[in-house]
Regions:
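Short, low-complexity, glycine-enriched hydrophobic/amphipathic alpha-helices that associate
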Residues: 1-49
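Helix-termini ("caps") and immediately adjacent flexible loops/tails
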Residues: 1-3, 39-184
């Protein structure tokens, strides 16, 4: 038995918060994604076959991807608030020019592409996390250590599912925004 150390196998204390906004964007997440409390796995005992180290490294990558997606969603939500404000201002002004409308539609389309990219990466990470859960069963970790990793993977999955729902909501909102601009 040797320790799986020196592999950067710390699942980190990630505090993943999704910013909430007032108004139409307020319901995007339906609350805070929640703190993903990672645990140190570097002191886990296992029979060394290399498989465990690779798996932990992959889980760390999944956590990094999850954090990136949360940050992207936060940033996107802030932009959505700004966009919504601009559309409201435009609707209040009867003299809206075509250049302004064209700019807003261009921004909306850009945000839609960003969301679709987030959705794609999010789905890929979700798929990988499911695979890691399966791989974990074939490792020689103790039952207790396996449960620790499974708990972390479960927290990542919950967070990713919330991001997925947020992306779907955001896409619907952007379609509504587009209609408002086109009919202004």
């Amino acid at each position: 038995m040797i320790q799986a150390t020196g592999i950067g196998a710390v699942l980190g204390g990630i505090t993943a918060k999704v910013t909430q906004h007032s108004g139409i964007v307020g319901a995007i997440i339906g609350g805070v994604v929640g703190a993903i409390t990672g645990q140190k796995l570097s002191n886990m005992q296992c029979d060394y076959e290399g498989q465990e180290e690779i798996l932990l490294s992959k889980i760390n990558t999944a956590i990094e991807n999850n954090t990136y997606l949360i940050n992207q969603t936060n940033s996107l939500n802030q932009h959505m608030s700004t966009l919504y404000s601009q559309i409201n201002t435009m609707q209040a002004n009867q003299q809206t020019n075509l250049r302004k409308k064209s700019y807003l539609i261009s921004e909306i389309n850009k945000k839609k592409r960003e969301i679709l990219n987030i959705k794609t990466l999010n789905n890929n990470v979700l798929l990988k996390v499911r695979q890691y859960n399966s791989l974990l069963k074939n490792t020689k970790y103790s039952k207790q250590d396996k449960e620790r990793v499974q708990n972390t993977l479960q927290k990542i999955t919950i967070s990713l599912q919330k991001i997925k729902r947020a992306s779907i909501y955001n896409l619907k909102q952007l379609d509504e925004f587009k209609k408002k601009v086109q009919h202004a």
